[in-house]
A protein has these predicted regions:
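Serine-esterase "nucleophile elbow" of acetyl-processing enzymes
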Residues: 1-60, 68
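Alpha-helical cap/lid subdomain in secreted, periplasmic
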Residues: 63-226
């Protein structure tokens, strides 16, 4: 959803270019599958994905959106992309916002710590790593995934069937829930066996996001026409 590895070719001259740069946001959000869907339907989109996010942070971010959105949620089409259940997020009330920080991002994601991010003090690093050692297991991943799917299924009923769910990497367990697409595989299955659709680190490239968009359009049409 976020658009890892989508980088504006016009910015490659910058020192240490990275997709997270604010200068790259219009390109990244415009070429990821959510932005492409917005162009297809000629409607505005809001992308709340974040690199390294978790099922928990997605839920917290969604609740932030509900509190701040000025439109009636029933007038919105809500797409929920579930990541892997073995990721964790922790709320940091002392988070220092940077220029590229959205207002809802006060999280420390385990993926950042395990990936070697250097912007966290030793207390966070120790706590996140200890949490993984003490709690990481398939049972907890399955619980996190089930909790997320069933929460958003409830939102789907509340808002009259305008919530579409899917997984990105694939589900840890199959779940049948109203509004959940492809309960036994994730979006990655549409691109993973086609090198021409992948960026160097195996995220979808621009063409890969177009393929994902094309798989989602019929499902969105079904919801719109229902």
């Amino acid at each position: 959803m976020w658009g890892d590895e989508l980088f504006d070719p016009g910015l490659t001259h910058l020192e240490k270019p990275h997709p997270v740069m604010v200068e790259n946001t219009p390109y990244r959000e415009g070429h990821c599958f959510l932005g492409l869907l917005g162009k297809h339907y000629n409607v505005p989109t809001e992308n709340f994905g974040i690199a390294g996010g978790s099922l928990q942070s997605s839920l917290w971010t969604y609740l932030w959106w509900l509190e701040h959105e000025q439109l009636d949620p029933r007038e919105c089409l809500i797409l929920v992309g579930h990541t892997e259940g073995n990721r964790d997020s922790f709320y940091n009330p002392r988070h220092v916002s940077y220029a590229n920080d959205p207002p809802w991002n006060k999280f420390v994601h385990s993926a950042w710590i395990h990936g070697g991010a250097t912007c966290f003090d030793s207390d966070w690093v120790t706590m996140v790593k200890a949490n993984m050692v003490l709690t990481n297991c398939n049972e907890l991943s399955n619980l996190a995934y089930r909790q997320s799917v069933l929460f958003f299924e409830g939102q789907n009923f509340k808002f009259q069937n305008n919530v579409i769910q899917f997984t990105t990497m694939g589900p840890s367990i199959p779940i049948n829930a109203k509004g959940l697409l492809w309960p036994e595989h994730g979006l990655v299955s549409f691109v993973k066996d086609n090198p021409e659709l992948l960026a160097p680190n195996k995220h979808p490239n621009e063409r890969g996001h177009e393929v994902i968009r094309d798989h989602l359009i019929p499902e969105i049409e079904r919801v719109i026409l229902a």
